[in-house]
Amino acid sequence: MQQSQSRSLVDWLSYLEQIHPANIDMGLERVGTVARRMGLTELPFKVITVAGTNGKGSSCAMAASILMAAGYRVGVYSSPHLLRFTERVRVNGQELDDGDHCAAFTEVEAARGDIALTFFEFATLAGLWLFRRAAPDVLLLEVGLGGGSMPPMWWSPTSP
């Protein structure tokens, strides 16, 4: 992508839909390689992975409310979004702005090199980059369909 820093969020999202031939491509190798390049292998906060067939969003919302009431700064990564892409990354209930997401996409794009990332992989890496900058005490990381083979699982304590 040319002039990636001057792209709007809409432009970035359109681009992300085109850079991988499949919507879903199971495996953690691509995410792991780019995460290492971005320095995202060791996150400076606790990560709670939320997985399961149903209720992940509700579980994240409830856990976030409890943790915030206890005085913690809480990040929540969820997918898919309902209305706006920025819903996927929230800190203490607040979405980050389009410019923050564009900056994160620029970082992922620079780190990925010739690795073709799916939309979800790219978005997850961008989200983790944003959370590292936002410095929550705890991150609730929702895992999508596919469970252990999905990008957020790379940061699970049982992953590589």
Predicted regions and their residues:
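A conserved segment at the C-terminal end of the G1
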Residues: K46-V50, S58-G75
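ATP-dependent carboxylate-amine ligase catalytic core
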Residues: R7-D11, A22-I24, L28-L43, A69-P157
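ATP-dependent carboxylate-amine ligase
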Residues: M1-R7
